[in-house]
Amino acid sequence: MFLRALNVWIASFSKFRALRTPATQLITLSVHKYSTVQRAIKIVGGFDMPGQGKAQQHKGKGREPQRKKQKAKEKSKAEGGADEVVELDVKNLLENNRRKSEENGEKHTDAETSVSVVHEGKKDSPFPETEVTVSELSSTGEGLALSPNGDHVYVVPFALPGETARVRIYKTIKPKSYSLTDLVEVLKPSKQRDDSLIKCQYFGKCSGCQLQMIPYQDQLQHKKRIIEKAYANFSGLLPELIPAIGDTMGSPMQYGYRTKLTPHFTQPARNRRQEHGSDAPEIPPIGFMMKGRRKVMDIEDCPLGTDIVRSGLKNERKRVAENLHQYPYGGTLLVRESTKRVERNKENEALPSTDKVIRTTFPEYVEEKTYITDQNGISVEYVEDYQFHNIAGTFFQNNNSILPSFTGYVRDNALHPEPKPDATPAESAAAAKSNPKLKYLLDAYCGSGLFTIVLSGTFRSSLGIDVAASSIKCARENAKLSNVPNTGFAAADAAALFKDVPYPADQTLLVIDPPRKGCDTNFLNQLLAYGPTRVLYVSCNVHTQARDVGVLVEGKNGVRYDIESIRGFDFFPQTSHVESVAVLTKAIETKEE
């Protein structure tokens, strides 16, 4: 029986390899395998959108904000990964459709007994095709389409709400009531679609971008919706505790903005078996992952990269092809922009740009852009007039064009609420004086010191802390380079981050910018025990941010926070990724019941 089943699987896989039929319209994708979908966090019922009611300031003695009721097994820590996010979007779409059906008196089919998926498409194909109409765009940038009887969802990449499309089903997750598909053909395009906006020859196959066919203002609206859903799905808070999400701040550059690319490749087994000096080795694909497949696409150019990074990508591809023997199993490459500003003179003004140096003349200096490929090399970035040196392989924001607006927003919200657009001068002045006692800045997860340094002029004293000693070394050097006074950095123990902080909590602003996984329980407990007056939570994953903010709003031992504002920032145009800043203020302390 086992051998028979194995032979059937091999035959099916052979058909699977042959099913790469070109589409006749718009976008073509190939069939592929996909990774197992991870566990989803389960939220009872549908959701209401944040901002429908004004965020309440619960100041009554002993009164704690109410969270959504959840089953015991549903309290496990959400990870905010792509699979988890898609599953929640699918779950909510199905529940909303079920609710509408019941309101209209329609009979609903149980997803567990439905046969709507099994018999669709070509019966002799292991990967059936079907026609769907997309209902909405998921938080991961994929279209979600309901089955005819509304009990199942098809996840369709590169498709937009309202579009009718032919898709190929390659995996069905019956317990979660959805299927993963390839887009074969767009039969009826949405009015929102504008394929003339697409600037990449690999779009529709490469997994890097999802939204190139959407006008930029529509991308920003979609990213605002992503944040709204993140707080509805992951925070566990009632809608009235979540303020209206602010409009997403756009990037000045929608292409040519990425200062770092990390293409990768796998050495073919044939090359590893060859003896040194034998036949010419096979050049593997060097680039990024194909959408939905565990396979690298050969990417010759990426229009998201800056000019010097794109030049560096081409040079690195050529270098690797000529030196494959140095990579017995493949590798991940680094191409990172570095900037040097030199005083203008006749000599450097006359120097031309090359494929390794791009020179631009400004009134006061000549800017030289180069690229770094050494993970341990030092890259140089300028944010406003501040200079930052970083170890090239470590984290630093990859979109320099939006950084001045982003850091300006953080600075404007460090001490007081952002004034309303229609505020009178008196109201603006009152808002500016709302937190006169804040004197100190504490920057956790400080990295190379971005926020500590940029915000230093606003506070009497600033301190950046991080568990990575190498980051602290860079931060100290950066403070010296920018001649920033009253600023210090310290390597801290993760188990006692706030133990030796010299600042009184009631006079301190805490800025946190954790990695994608967000803050762990230990850190959040330490934060609540320290209890700073104001918290600015900067996040590259709005789902884990929403989860963590929910914990801070719920509070512990009489310390909790209210959400003042939430706003997204588009660091990665053309993708579904959005970053967010949540501003929290400490509520009046209450006694735990």
Predicted regions and their residues:
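N-terminal mitochondrial targeting presequence
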Residues: M1-K42
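Extended interfacial segments that mediate partner engagement and assembly in macromolecular machines
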Residues: L187-I198, G204-A321
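SH3/SH3-like beta-barrel fold
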Residues: G143-S147, V167-I169, T181
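Rossmann-like S-adenosyl-L-methionine
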Residues: R39-K68, E74-D110, K122-K123, S139, ...
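Short, basic/aromatic beta-hairpin or loop at an interaction surface
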Residues: V134-P148
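Beta-strand/loop nucleic-acid-binding surfaces
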Residues: L146-P161
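Terminal, basic amphipathic appendages of nucleotide-handling enzymes
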Residues: P50, G62, A72, S76-P126, ...
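Flexible glycine-rich surface loops and low-complexity tracts that mediate binding to linear polymers
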Residues: T130-E136, E163-K174, G331-E337
